Amino acid sequence: MADLEGGTALSLDRHLGASDTAEAIESYTEIEIPESLRDNLVLFLRMERKVLKEYDPAVCALFDRLFNSMIRANEGNPGTVAADEPTDAQGIPTADTEGARAFREAVELIDALPVDQAQVVVRAFASFFHLANLSEENYRVETLRELERNVSMESAVDTSNELVVAYGHLLDEVGPERTAELLGRLEFHPVFTAHPTEARRKAVEGKIRRIAALLDEHPYLGGSALLENERHMLQEIDALVRTSPTELKKPTPLEEADTIIDIFDNTLFDTVPQVYRRFDDWVLGEDAGSVPPVCPAFFRPGSWIGSDRDGNPNVTAKVSRRVAAKYFAHMVAKLAQECRNIGRNLTLESRYTAPSEELMNLWSHLVEMSETLTGRVADDLGFEPHRAVMLVMAARLEGTVARNADIMYLSPEELLADLRTVQDSLARAGAARAAYGPVQTLIWQVETFGFHMVEMEFRQHSLVHERALADIRSHGVLGKLDPMTREVLDTFRAIGAIQKRYGQKMARRYIVSFTKSARHMADVYELAELAFSHAQDVPELDVIPLFEQLEDLENCVTVLDGMLQLPAVQRRLAQTGRRME
């Protein structure tokens, strides 16, 4: 490493060589590093230094010196300060040891830098840490692939797939019928938030994603292909260092929704059905893709973005409506695109894949709905009927985005019914691999994401509800109410509007933070009823208590017992088959 003051570190007049880089990384971690992980860390450290030196040799020198101090500060205790090591009020170690001295040197160096220069150095480290994380992720993926390669096709269980392992245990313990029942009830519900510590620009995400793809290819390349790979990687790393990690202004809740959409487009939409498919591939074996699937659509993503208003005045009823509309439009457009892609490739001639009577009835229904849409593909009907139907279904989905009342799908269930008609027709005609291949993948995507993409979870503080009810009791629903009270009522009206327009699943969860009694649950149901003039307009809600303090957790059983006695909760339990969160 470099030492600006002429210490014992490496000189500045040359780049860090591969062997020096490897030694530095090994010293830094002080743990045994797998060779492939070390190679990637070496590669990225060399590239980071090359980019920094091209940008400004002085910045590269500062990076070297701080990196060197970081390594020495972690000697003997990688990654943290020892629990019994004395520190000052700022957490800086005060002991007279090599590691403590290195730590203090790094702090003093950073404190002495001008703000602009400190920002550049911090950005350099931030970009390198992104690259280090990519190295670890790449190694984890390679490890999982190696585990899969070691699984014998003769094995009863795929030991690399936790879902398959659990399924195998259930078969042994409770038998096939009970296992099928439990599998049908499986649900995985991750929730996306807009926590500041998780904020990352889409521009940065895109660069990291492209570097990850290049790193994945790197070990398999040679010659000019390898040179081009590394040139492209350097280009992306250079751009990463020069790109601000944060937006110029704080994103609005509507802009934060783009984070979910980006994750959806680049990961969830394609990856989730692949998870289902991998389970089916092992459980069904050679029959996979030619018989009805076993794996249910168990993934149910949720989101607090655009709906969590506890302490966030920027999330209003109007914002929630706009975020819901954004999710809906993107989701249905994505389904339309996928439906059209499948339709274009469903070129199965009718003389080899005869359409079922139900498929022809569906076509007749589509003709009655719109001769314009069906007229565009009418010539295909006698030749490739399944293709013709799927293309019209795609056009209906496009009409759904445009809110064309004449042709739009009113619900994802209506779309699923049409897809299953196509699937059943293909299967009966002997084209099982088309039925349970691409068409089944689209069915899984509709079952998983519906038209809503994510289930919005509304959250508000229990005290806000108490104050709103007190205000209403004093002035009446139509009286002069406090702005926050009006916003609370508008929130329930927004939930009702979202449910009517986009389906109940998009906005049925309502979380009460700092729940201290069953009364706080009752407050939500009461406010929901007060927000509407007609009882039939009141939305269905799954009100969920959030216990955030130790005292509340200790009292949670009493609160839940009281909650179960509420008439609104009993009514909701009757609708959900006695299930609640």
Model regions: which residues?
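Conserved alpha/beta-domain cores
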Residues: V291-P292, S307, V315, D424, ...
